[in-house]
Amino acid sequence: MRLFLSLPVWVAVLAMVLEGPAPAQAAPEISSTLGSIPDKLKEFGNTLEDKARAAIESIKQSDIPAKTRNWFSETFNKVKEQLKTAFS
């Protein structure tokens, strides 16, 4: 019974393999592939630039840099006061 059921499956698979690639699956020519590389690189560069600019703008608009700067200033002043009182 198993052989009877698997035989049509093997015939279908063999027919698909022997048929070869469909026209849409044919490999593109090397010249067209090489010709499109500069356009793809330019598109990648533009996308990367846009994402980098957006990230920088979001960092500029956030309050993280100001909070970090204030924390460092406060910590530095505390350390400076402690050193001043320790060595006075």
UniProtKB/Swiss-Prot annotation:
Report if keyword Plastid is assigned.
no
Q: Where in the cell is it found?
A: Secreted
Q: What keywords would UniProt list here? A: Lipid transport, Secreted, Signal, Transport, VLDL
Query: Where does the UniProt annotation place the signal sequence?
Result: 1-26
Supply the InterPro entries for this chain: ApoC-1_sf, ApoC-I
Biological process annotations from GO: cholesterol efflux; cholesterol metabolic process; chylomicron remnant clearance; lipoprotein metabolic process; negative regulation of cholesterol transport; negative regulation of fatty acid biosynthetic process; negative regulation of phosphatidylcholine catabolic process; negative regulation of receptor-mediated endocytosis
Quote the PANTHER family the UniProt record gives. Answer: APOLIPOPROTEIN C-I
Q: Outline what the protein does.
A: Inhibitor of lipoprotein binding to the low density lipoprotein (LDL) receptor, LDL receptor-related protein, and very low density lipoprotein (VLDL) receptor. Associates with high density lipoproteins (HDL) and the triacylglycerol-rich lipoproteins in the plasma and makes up about 10% of the protein of the VLDL and 2% of that of HDL. Appears to interfere directly with fatty acid uptake and is also the major plasma inhibitor of cholesteryl ester transfer protein (CETP). Binds free fatty acids and reduces their intracellular esterification.
Name assigned to this protein? Apolipoprotein C-I
Q: Which organism is it from?
A: Ursus maritimus
Q: What is the lineage of its organism?
A: Eukaryota, Metazoa, Chordata, Craniata, Vertebrata
